[in-house]
Amino acid sequence: MLIDHDALKELCNSPVNKDKNGEFTQDPEAQWNVKAGSDGQRKSTYGFKAHINADEDGLITSTDYTPGNVHDSNCFTSLLDGDESAVYADSAYASEKHATWLKAHKVESRIIRRAYINKPLTTKDKQFNRLHSGTRCTVERVFGVLKLHYDTAKARYMGLNRNRTRFELMCVAHNIKRGQSIRQYSCA
């Protein structure tokens, strides 16, 4: 199973915006998220995070939707359904707690290894990352499709539950379309 997350901006993402009645337009259930951009600079966004578990065909098997300040690894075990043979994820999910959980449930860990301060990656860890990072492109592609075709890059409603419901409906639509595509090309 492939696990990943994506930060979704809240539509009215500035806490100082006020509507014509003088009330804040900021969603009180959304939170700030800080992550490194592609240029290496830290970027802050206000909104939610979407977490998905996808299989090797790109079908979404489980989702979670949280405020932006929830760390990605907090949703790890809730995304797993128990019948996985291996789990692929980025280094945000690397922890002793998760390694222990995976070992106890006899699931092979293919979580990308992370370097720490004064502890660079070994050659073996670099080879492991190179070998398994290519498989993760499937889940990244799912997020790309959700953003491009289903407009999930921004939260459209006020409130966590409304946005979660919308995201889950988009995931259902994605699975229907993806399932039809798999069926079409497997019969040919």
Regions picked out by a protein language model, each given a short descriptive name:
Residues H105-R113:
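Short hydrophobic/aromatic-enriched beta-strand-loop microsegments
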Residues N74, K97, N118-D125:
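Short, charged, surface-exposed secondary-structure boundary motifs
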Residues V87-Y88, R110-I111, S181:
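Acidic/polar loop patches that form or flank catalytic/metal-binding clefts of enzymes
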Residues D125-A188:
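Basic, amphipathic alpha-helical segments enriched in Lys/Arg and hydrophobic/aromatic residues
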Residues P67-G68, R113-I117:
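Short, acidic/turn-prone active-site loops that include or flank metal/cofactor-
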Residues M1-S91, E96-A104:
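Polybasic low-complexity intrinsically disordered regions
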Residues L102-K103, A115, P120:
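Feature captures the catalytic cores and cofactor-binding loops of soluble hydro-lyases/lyases
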Residues S91, R113-R114, R141:
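Short secondary-structure boundary segments
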